[in-house]
């Protein structure tokens, strides 16, 4: 189910986001007092080095390591940056950045801020609900859906925040849970999961095709993530 920038939803989200921000500020103040002398502990997890290179019809390859300056800016403790391909030449770029702690200034960077900095302009934005068929997991997950463009090139971007078994599309809700879990669980570990699929201008219904490919990739990817992003 696709929601493309609906105005009533946008207004409701804006009001809700303001309320969340206020609550996060209040909760953060309380958390700073409660957690001042408590060392943070994150559950053990598998390294992305061990993440499968093949995902049920998708075969991947690791991209060159990121520049040290970029990694310093991102502040990730572990990350995965790969390109995956299907036999029918469909492709998907996968980035997952994991943060063991977000207490010392290292925080997840939203693609909404990073992609324009790389020259990509947002053309459409909304939410996409992806059905998941795997035991012990949600039956569907909600993700951010963006179409971006640079020159004549267009790409479809799906991304979400994942922490402690939750999949969160809204950036403000992710901040709320970050502070709440810091207070109640003494944990701030979390990850950003981003999937990018090129939109082939030469194909009919190119955007719809790209979305179908992205959904298929997410459905193969998501059931494997819990071992690397602990709940």
Describe each model-derived feature in a short phrase.
Residues 1-10:
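N-terminal Lys/Arg-rich, disordered targeting/topogenic segments
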Residues 9-23:
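N-terminal Sec-pathway targeting helices
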Residues 19-33:
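Hydrophobic membrane-insertion alpha-helices, especially the h-region
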Residues 24-25, 51, 214:
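Active-site-proximal structural scaffolding
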Residues 30-42:
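Membrane-interface motif at the C-terminal end of an N-terminal transmembrane signal
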Residues 39-55:
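Alpha-helical transmembrane signal-anchor/signal-peptide segments
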Residues 52-83:
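Short extracytoplasmic
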Residues 80, 84-220, 224-229:
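A cross-kingdom signal targeting lumenal/periplasmic-facing segments of multi-pass membrane
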């Amino acid at each position: 189910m696709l929601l493309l920038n609906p105005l009533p939803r946008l207004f409701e989200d804006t009001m809700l986001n303001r309320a969340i921000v206020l609550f996060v500020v209040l909760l953060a103040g309380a958390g700073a007092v409660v957690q001042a002398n408590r060392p943070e502990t994150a559950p053990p997890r598998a390294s992305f080095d061990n993440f499968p290179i093949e995902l049920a019809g998708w075969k991947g390859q690791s991209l060159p390591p990121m520049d040290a300056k970029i990694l310093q800016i991102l502040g990730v403790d572990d990350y995965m940056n790969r390109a995956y391909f299907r036999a029918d030449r469909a492709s998907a770029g996968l980035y997952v950045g994991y943060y063991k702690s977000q207490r010392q200034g290292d925080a997840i960077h939203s693609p909404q801020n990073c992609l324009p900095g790389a020259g990509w302009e947002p053309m459409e934005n909304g939410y996409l609900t992806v059905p998941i068929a795997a035991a012990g997991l949600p039956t569907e997950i909600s993700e951010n859906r963006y179409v971006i463009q640079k020159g004549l090139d267009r790409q479809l971007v799906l991304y979400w925040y994942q922490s402690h078994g939750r999949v969160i599309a809204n950036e403000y809700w992710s901040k709320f849970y970050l502070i709440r879990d810091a207070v109640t669980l003494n944990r701030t570990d979390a990850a950003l999961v981003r999937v990018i699929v090129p939109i082939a201008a030469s194909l009919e219904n190119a955007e719809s095709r790209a979305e179908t490919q992205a959904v298929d990739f997410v459905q193969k990817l998501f059931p494997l993530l819990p071992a690397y992003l602990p709940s």
